[in-house]
Amino acid sequence: LIKDVFVVDASAHSYNLREDNYAAGRYSRAVVDAFHGAHYGLSPVGYRIPRERYTRDWTLAETATMLFVESDYDFACHHVTPINAFKDGGCSIQKAREAREKWPGRFQVYAGVDPVFPEQALDSLEQQVEELNPVGLKLYPNSYTVDSVVGWHMDDPEIAFPLFQRALDLGLKAVAIHKAIPLGPVPMEHYRMDDIDAAAAAFPDLQFEVVHGGFAFIEETAFQLARFPNVWVNLETTANLAVAKPGAFERVMAGLITHAGEGALDRIMWASGASVLHPEPPLRWFCERFQFSQEMREREGLPEITDEIKRKILGLNYLRMHGLDAETLAKNIEGDEFAVERSKGKPKPYATTYAIGFAE
C-alpha cells in the first residue's frame, strides 16, 4: 500500500440478513436481493459468496477481521442501519454497542433512526446517544411496511429539520444519508439529490455525507460539493466500481472534480460497505492502480491523483471531519489483537469468517 497511509472505512456494517429477521415481506426479500446482487456483481472472482452462505447474521467480529486482518484498514465507522424492512434495522444497536465497548480503538459509531416516525426517531436518537456515544447519524430515505413504502425528504421542515436540530443539540457532527442506490422496488424520487440542498443550507454546522455518492447523479452530487462546504461524498459501494468497472469509477471521480473543482478531493471519503462486500479488493486497486488516463487528464483538465490525494480520500478527510488525529489513532492500535494477526500474513478472503471456504 501507499507508505504512511492510515486507512479509514467511513461506513461498515454487520448485517443480519436471515429470513427470520424480515419485517416487511417482499420488500425485505428485495433489500436482501439488492445486497447480494451488489455483492456478487461488484466483487472479483475469489470474493463472491453464494446466496445461501451470504444471507445470514454477520457478526461484528467478522466485520472487524475482514477489515483489520484480511484487509489493510486501520479504523472504521460502524453504522446502526435503520432499515425497517428488518426487525433489528439490519445492523442493530447492539452490534454498534459491541463495537464501542470491545474495540474502541478501532471503531466509532453512527446512530440510526427512521424519520418517517418522528417522535420515535427523536426518542431513539437520544437513547442511542446515551448508549453508544455516536459521532453521527445514519438515515435511509424510505420506510417499509408489509405492503407499502413511505418516503421522506431531507428538506422537509416538519420531519427532517427537527431531527437535524436534535442531532446538533446532542453534539453529533454528521448526518449520513443513503442516496443513489434504491433498495428494492421503491420510488426513485427519495434517492435523488435535490432535497439535500435546503438541508445543507439550513444546517451549516452539520456535515452531510452522501452515502453511495456518485453511483448515480454524478453532476448533481458535484454541484452540491461545489455549493455547500458541508456536503461530503461517502464512496461506499461506489468504491467497488474501481474493481468491477474501473472506467465507470474513473468517470465518477472525473465528474466530481470537473464540476466541483479540485477542492472536492478534500470532501471525498473512502468506504467499503463491509459486510455487504469484502473491503480488500477496491482498496488494493485504488492504492496501486487508480489514476486518470493521460487522455482524460488532457481532455478534462484533471489533476494527477498523487499519493497525497489518495491519503486524504483513504482516511485523512474522514479524520478531519471528526477532529481525529491519525498518529494518535495509530498509536492506540499498536500491538492490538488485529495488528498481531495481520503481522502473521494476510489470510485468504473470508478465511476469518463463517464463510470460510465458500468464496467463488
Predicted regions located by residue number:
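Mid-to-C-terminal alpha-helical segments outside catalytic/metal-binding sites
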Residues: 1-10, 17-66, 262-267, 277-360
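Divalent metal-coordination and catalytic microenvironments
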Residues: 11, 68, 76, 109, ...
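Short aromatic-enriched loop/helix-cap "lid" or pocket-rim segments at secondary-structure transitions
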Residues: 18-24, 90, 122-124, 149-152, ...
